[in-house]
From Swiss-Prot:
Signal peptide segment: 1-26
Bridged cysteine pairs (disulfide): none
Domain of life the protein comes from: Eukaryota
Organism: Aspergillus niger (strain ATCC MYA-4892 / CBS 513.88 / FGSC A1513)
Protein name (database record): Aurasperone B biosynthesis cluster protein A
Function per UniProt: Part of the gene cluster that mediates the biosynthesis of aurasperone B, a dimeric gamma-naphthopyrone. The first step in the biosynthesis of aurasperone B is the production of gamma-naphthopyrone precursor YWA1 by the non-reducing polyketide synthase albA, via condensation of one acetyl-CoA starter unit with 6 malonyl-CoA units.
Protein family per UniProt: Belongs to the bfoA family.
Annotated glycan sites: N29, N34, N64, N83, N132, N183, N218, N288
Keyword annotations: Glycoprotein, Signal
Length: 305
């Protein structure tokens, strides 16, 4: 299926699918809903259909996507946890919805589910998503995303856990592509990427982070901090005090400056900060519902208090 066909066809088809799902899928028996595997497959593919560009634009414009419950919980291994439908709508759909804006991976244009198993109201899947990295000469890059998703009785996502597989390899590939395009070394490409991301973040700051939301004294101070005071970041540091973390949050500033401006500022807000050790990251108690199916979940250390 071509991208051009998708642009014409998907919005209407996806909207119809979203309206249809809650009417026909499994209902709650008083506890967790018990969907068939076919129904869970439909819920899974509906999410990924909406994740692709330009369908994700429609989801982003909804502010609170109907694909999520109001109190949805989400965790992404390379970043952090995200609470609530509005925040998840911004990060899941808004982050990858503008092909003309500087970004690491651009916009998602296709996907293939390569692994899938489901029971009750939970599905575990591996999805290879093709991104058009528009900031890297429209380089098409496959990105492998492992997900656990849990739905409520109305077919809405109530919690998810996502892992970007081989993300370090992906970052190296993007830097190598940039090095080739500028006919330079990987060190020169890394410096060029750092400057590009910092310039973009500071331009966004100057436009949206004004008045009480201002984080830097001026553009020069912003560039100095982002290029000299913090590292670019490793593949697992998109939720730490790095430039890559601020690149992620820069996309969200336009939607809610009061919330997101601190994330691109010197303090990092409560997202781009070094507040967790490795063990704290791994052992973080977070989810309201256990991912364990069919047997007692006693001893599940990820369950929130």
């Amino acid at each position: 299926m071509s991208i051009f066909f998708s642009i014409r066809f998907w919005p209407a088809a996806i909207s119809a699918a979203i309206l249809w799902l809650p009417q026909v899928l499994g209902r709650s028996n008083g506890t967790a809903p018990n969907y068939t595997v076919e129904e869970l497959w439909k819920l899974e593919t509906t999410f990924w259909d909406n994740f692709l560009y330009p369908a994700n634009v429609e989801q982003m414009e909804a502010i609170n996507s109907t694909l999520f419950t109001q109190d949805v919980q989400g965790r992404v291994d390379i970043t952090r946890v995200f609470n609530g439908s509005e925040l998840n709508t911004e990060y899941i759909f808004g982050l990858f919805s503008d092909p003309d804006h500087v970004s690491l991976v651009g916009v998602p244009v296709d996907y293939s589910i390569t692994q899938f198993i489901a029971q009750g109201n939970i599905a575990s899947a591996t999805t290879v998503v093709t991104f058009n990295a528009t900031s890297f000469g429209n380089l098409l890059v496959p990105v492998t995303i492992d997900t656990w998703i849990m739905w409520d009785a109305d077919g809405r996502i109530m919690q998810y856990d996502a892992t970007f597989r081989w993300f370090g390899f992906l970052l190296d590939t993007l830097v190598e592509a940039l090095a080739e395009s500028i006919n330079g070394t990987t060190s020169q490409a890394t410096a060029s990427l750092t400057q590009l991301l910092a310039t973009t973040i500071c331009a966004t700051h100057d436009q949206y982070c004004t008045g009480s939301n201002q984080q830097y004294d001026n553009n020069t101070a912003c560039l100095d901090f982002l290029t000299s005071a913090i590292p670019l970041g490793k593949d697992y540091e998109l939720g730490r005090n790095t430039l890559l973390c601020r690149e992620v949050h820069e996309h969200m500033v336009q939607y809610d400056p009061a919330l997101h401006c601190p994330h691109i500022g010197p303090t990092g807000g409560d997202y781009c900060v070094d507040d967790q050790t490795y063990a704290q990251k791994v052992l973080q108690k977070y989810f309201n519902q256990s991912w364990i199916v069919g047997v007692p979940s006693t001893g599940d250390i990820w369950l929130g208090d």
